[in-house]
């Protein structure tokens, strides 16, 4: 007898080996119809897989996260089925599940077009309507090779070569189409009805730009239509908020092909940059950091000492002068150690906190570049704290408080916290790691926040805290970090005089709150949909005259506002006032002031707030107080 224990601890007995689907059928026909797969003793298996021993079983349905992932993976296979029917000479490569969807990489003689994508989606729906079973066959390695060789699937053969130890592999048959996968997959195409192909892109075999280019078809799949509709709505909203689109519409920045991955900031974009940088400079000042500035080009000997030259050189921009090799710095840490060791330091000097708006360069692949979010040249709010082991806890508590204030001021209210602990390969004693891990976790506990632990994900030189933001669309952005480092200061000869007149290497805490300013500004643009709060807005108020007779008064209003340190745009163009109001409203300005004869004579302004709110007439003094208060309150 085979005894199956279900999640509620009830048991069912069967006279012999039994499939997951048969167990589901014994429970009820409704569950059987919903069965996507099973989890046997914690391992996912196909619904057709047979259980031949006493086991715990969970039936997986589309309502389970695992079920949804299986549906997405099977929909990727369905893409392959449709593509091979429509384009028989196409070579299928790989089709994994990604967050909220899937993609399939395909080798074909020409790029796919939007019309091709529509045809593929239509064929997929025709295949789903046939309601066919997906058949799994565990197949000996030699036979797998013959199957793909006979079909001319060169990439599948290369993938088989990558798995020399696999003597049998799962082949999944969609009618005449066959694909290779560890599985599990859905038992029938009826589970695949709620899907949509979303976009086309280029890709490279094995993600290497030196290899052949492939076509990538992206898609999404869900358990029900409501979920799909919500997803499409989120994507459409994300497209409206795309920082690349808004950056152009609001005249903030552009990226030119002469400088891929490096940003050209326009006047309004640079005003936004300055608002962020000056705010962060104030944070440095208020929390005991000394602002420093290091060189951008450093000799290769330094990078050899840090290990970057040996392990990171492909990601660095290098140059040569007078028979010496140099690199543009990809990070600021070594420079801060050199500043630290430029003088004899005492334990009384610790903790010593340096902060820099350090410009870094990394040679990112061109295919990975994305607007100002993923660039080659970027500036970080990079800070390093040199301290003793006993000071780690207090510094982490103080840093977390800083970070929470900064994120709240920028409009982010939800933060996720993660602690990455010691990996197998590491420097430092277990006692030192115990102390450091306790310090970073206790710092978060004292901050009153929940956190998750990611075992083994710390760097070899110390544990770290990762701070992840959620934006207005619920997307997650890993921004802040607090990285404990037992290694770099020692490696570069940084030391201080101890209380007993000995010498010791300081612990180095790497910290960034916004990280890359370029990326953070991209996040701000998308989070606020371009309608930045008044304190950040590149132009906080526009002053418009109705006719030429109020030009001088409008100019004096603008001057008064500028004298208060406000960012003002004066528009004296000879255009209809309705046109001028619309023009500046589309720029998402916090305020528009209109002045006509009535306002001029009263020394007043007619105020319109963002969102087409007519606040009526008020004295210029009252408006100045209002806007200055908005800025002070970070509104």
UniProtKB/Swiss-Prot annotation:
The keyword Cytoplasm applies. It is an enzyme of class 6 (ligase). Zn(2+) binds at residues 333, 384, 510. Gene3D superfamilies: 3.10.20.30, 3.30.54.20, Anticodon-binding domain, Bira Bifunctional Protein, Domain 2, Threonyl-trna Synthetase, Chain A, domain 2. Its cofactor is Zn(2+). InterPro entries: aa-tRNA-synt_IIb, aa-tRNA-synth_II, aa-tRNA-synth_II/BPL/LPL, Anticodon-bd, Anticodon-bd_dom_sf, Beta-grasp_dom_sf, TGS, TGS-like. Its EC number is 6.1.1.3. The keyword ATP-binding applies. PROSITE patterns: AA_TRNA_LIGASE_II, TGS. Residues 1-61 form the TGS domain. SUPFAM superfamilies: Class II aaRS ABD-related (SSF52954), Class II aaRS and biotin synthetases (SSF55681), TGS-like (SSF81271), ThrRS/AlaRS common domain (SSF55186). It is found in: Cytoplasm. It comes from the Bacteria. It catalyses: tRNA(Thr) + L-threonine + ATP = L-threonyl-tRNA(Thr) + AMP + diphosphate + H(+). GO terms for molecular function: ATP binding; metal ion binding; threonine-tRNA ligase activity; tRNA binding. Disulfide bonds: none annotated. Binds 1 zinc ion per subunit. One of its GO terms (biological process) is threonyl-tRNA aminoacylation. NCBIfam families: thrS. PANTHER family: THREONINE--TRNA LIGASE, CHLOROPLASTIC_MITOCHONDRIAL 2, THREONINE-TRNA LIGASE. Belongs to the class-II aminoacyl-tRNA synthetase family. This is Threonine--tRNA ligase. It comes from Variovorax paradoxus (strain S110). The lineage of its organism: Bacteria, Pseudomonadati, Pseudomonadota, Betaproteobacteria, Burkholderiales.
């Amino acid at each position: 007898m085979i005894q199956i224990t279900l999640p509620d601890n009830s048991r069912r007995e069967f006279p012999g080996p039994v499939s997951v689907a048969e167990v589901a059928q014994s429970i009820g026909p409704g569950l059987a119809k919903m069965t996507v797969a099973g989890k046997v003793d914690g391992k996912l298996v196909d619904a057709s897989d047979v259980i031949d021993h006493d086991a715990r079983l969970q039936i997986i349905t589309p309502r389970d996260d695992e079920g949804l992932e299986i549906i997405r993976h099977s929909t990727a296979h369905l893409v392959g089925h449709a593509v091979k029917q429509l384009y028989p000479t196409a070579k299928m490569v790989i089709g994994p599940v990604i967050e909220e969807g899937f993609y399939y990489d395909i080798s074909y003689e020409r790029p796919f077009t939007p019309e091709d994508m529509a045809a593929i989606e239509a064929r997929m729906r025709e295949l789903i309507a046939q309601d066919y079973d997906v058949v799994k066959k565990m197949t000996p390695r030699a036979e797998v090779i013959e199957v793909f060789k006979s079909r001319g699937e060169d990439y599948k053969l290369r993938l088989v070569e990558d798995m020399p130890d696999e003597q049998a592999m799962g082949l999944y048959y969609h009618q005449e189409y066959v694909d290779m996968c560890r599985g599990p997959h859905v038992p029938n195409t009826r589970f695949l009805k709620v899907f949509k192909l979303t976009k086309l892109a280029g890709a490279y075999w094995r993600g290497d730009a030196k290899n052949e280019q492939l076509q990538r078809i992206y898609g999404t799949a869900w358990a029900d239509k409501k979920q799909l509709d919500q997803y499409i709505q989120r994507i459409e909203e994300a497209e409206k908020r795309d920082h690349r689109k808004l950056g152009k519409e609001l005249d903030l920045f552009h990226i030119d092909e002469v400088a891929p991955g490096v940003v050209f900031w326009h006047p309004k974009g640079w005003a936004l940059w300055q608002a962020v940088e000056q705010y962060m400079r104030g944070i440095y000042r208020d929390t005991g950091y000394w602002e420093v500035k290091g060189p951008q080009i450093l000799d290769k000997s330094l990078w050899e000492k840090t290990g970057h030259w040996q392990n990171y050189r492909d990601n660095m921009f290098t140059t040569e002068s007078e028979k010496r090799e140099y690199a543009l710095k990809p990070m600021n840490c070594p420079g801060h150690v050199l500043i630290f060791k430029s003088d004899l330091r005492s334990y009384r000097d610790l903790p010593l906190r340096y902060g820099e708006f350090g410009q870094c360069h990394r040679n990112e692949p061109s295919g990975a570049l994305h607007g100002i979010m993923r660039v080659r040249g970027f500036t970080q709010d990079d800070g390093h704290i040199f301290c003793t082991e006993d000071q780690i806890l207090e510094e982490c508590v103080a840093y977390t408080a800083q970070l929470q204030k900064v994120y709240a001021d920028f409009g982010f209210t939800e933060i996720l916290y993660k602690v990455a602990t010691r990996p197998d390969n590491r420097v430092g004693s277990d006692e030192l790691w115990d102390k450091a891990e306790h310090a970073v976790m206790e710092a978060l506990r004292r901050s009153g926040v929940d956190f998750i632990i990611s075992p083994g994900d710390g760097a070899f030189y110390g544990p770290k805290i990762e701070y992840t933001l959620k934006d207005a669309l619920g997307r997650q952005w890993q921004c802040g970090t607090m990285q404990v480092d037992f290694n770099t200061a020692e490696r570069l000869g940084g030391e201080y005089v101890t209380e007993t007149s000995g010498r010791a290497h300081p612990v180095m805490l790497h910290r960034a709150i916004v990280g890359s300013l370029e990326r953070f500004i991209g996040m701000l643009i998308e989070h606020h949909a371009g309608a930045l709060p008044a304190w950040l807005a590149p132009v906080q108020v526009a002053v418009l005259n109705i006719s030429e007779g109020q030009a001088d008064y409008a100019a004096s209003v603008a001057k008064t506002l500028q004298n208060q340190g406000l960012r003002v745009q004066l528009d004296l163009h000879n255009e209809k006032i309705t046109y001028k109001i619309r023009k500046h409203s589309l720029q998402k300005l916090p305020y528009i002031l209109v002045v006509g004869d009535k306002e001029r004579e009263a020394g007043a302004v007619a105020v319109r707030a963002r969102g087409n709110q007519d606040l009526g007439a008020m004295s210029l003094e009252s408006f100045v107080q209002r806007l200055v208060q908005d800025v002070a309150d970070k509104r």
